[in-house]
Amino acid sequence: MLYENIKKLVQYGVETGLTPACEKNYTINLLLDVFKEDEYVEPEEEYRDIDLEEVLNALLDEAVKRNLIEDSVVYRDLFDTRLMNCLMPRPAQVQNEFWSRYEKDPQEATDYFYKLSQDSDYIRRYRVKKDQKWTVDSEYGKIDITINLSKPEKDPKAIAAAKLVKSSSYPKCLLCPENEGYAGRVNHPARENHRIIPITVNDSPWGFQYSPYVNYNEHCIVFNSQHVPMKIEKNTFIKLFDFVKLFPHYFLGSNADLPIVGGSILSHDHFQGGHYTFAMAKAPIEKHVTIPGYEDVEAGIVKWPLSVLRIRHKNEKRLIELATHVLEAWRGYTDESAFIFAETDGEPHNTITPIARRSGDMFELDLTLRNNITTDEHPLGVYHPHAEYHHIKKENIGLIEVMGLAVLPARLKEELELLAEYILEGKDISSNEKIEKHAAWVAEFLPKYDNLDKDNIQDVLRKEVGNVFVHVLEDAGVYKCTAEGREAFMRFINKL
């Protein structure tokens, strides 16, 4: 069995282009060594169209049988990453191939690198496809919803083992370039099959890679080669446009640099981008504005639940200057009547979530105004999902959500299935502790629907989840989409 599966894995490497045919013997020997095996008899059968997940599972079962690893998802993931690295080209080979394709066409280079990141199992296609995805129509356009199921749940044994591992600061975090080739440990994922493309932005060395969890098409991460914290400043806008000039078919955005309104990693300066058009990018300008000193720059308030100023120009340098002006003005801006405070007790509250893209021959920058103030009524944030929506989403509204994609917790899959059953059978939702938190929400929307049955219940639940997410985005908007909110927004713009 071992020989068969080794042959299949090597054949997969050759078929996908990870492994040159002339390196077959070399690769077989690397794999034998991982299994502490010094014999090999080539199976006669030829294999085609190999199912990677199947082959890896068979090899992992073999490793468990030989007591090479414990049988748990954490140890299996560490081990199969090591197996995949035996098939992989070295980092310099990947970089050379990338840049030689880039000379012909930047998109050809990213296509190659994206395919490699999937073929190598760094992006586990068979897990990513478990994610549930749908769209919901809203007054702001088609909103994307995804329930993230591609991150495996850790088992209790591995969690206990992770607690016993002495803490390490190598690599400092999951975004550090030192992850490339790292074997991992019980509390840090293996990254042996991970490859990074070095790029230069704002005259400094950065890295370009894909997210292993692919929330949308070609979801990439662009990160500082130094472990330095997130900071929104003039240089941020320069870096965003440097990248968009390198890869005109990609957008790139940054999470805000303050807690609550920022992303999950504030400790390492990074951006996220990709080859995807979000609802926010399609949203039209609701009101055109002219900013003194920047009359040549197209500017306007976007029809979007968050408060977004879109600026456009053929010369990105004009956008960098204007964005810096807006950022500095917003950082120091207070409007008590609109409950906008630049700071309280010396703690700053105002920042921006910026997103840069090409639009034909124009450069475009969306500046999303953010504020992280908290109150007794809203201890997690005034401009953050309010408590009534926490049953669906209570995590931060980061860059991806700002653009119109809800990344919802895995628990919702089971909860929505249970809700469907309880609604159709007329059972009391509040009697089940897993779904009681949804009872008030269901009671509110149920009267809108007459003939619910097993064929339409999931569609109704998905639509209502989408409606909740739109409300969550409205909560995160510092200026509401009302006459009063727009008036307050214009007060800020007139200060520019």
Predicted segments, located by residue:
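Active-site microenvironments that recognize anionic phosphate/pyrophosphate groups
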Residues: 1-229, 303-305, 319-323, 329-405, ...
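Helical scaffold of the NTase/Pol beta-like nucleotidyltransferase catalytic core
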Residues: 193-195, 227-252
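Catalytic or ion-translocation cores adjacent to nucleophile or general acid/base/metal-coordination motifs
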Residues: 244, 248-264, 273-334
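Amphipathic alpha-helical segments that form well-ordered structural scaffolds
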Residues: 239-243, 325, 468
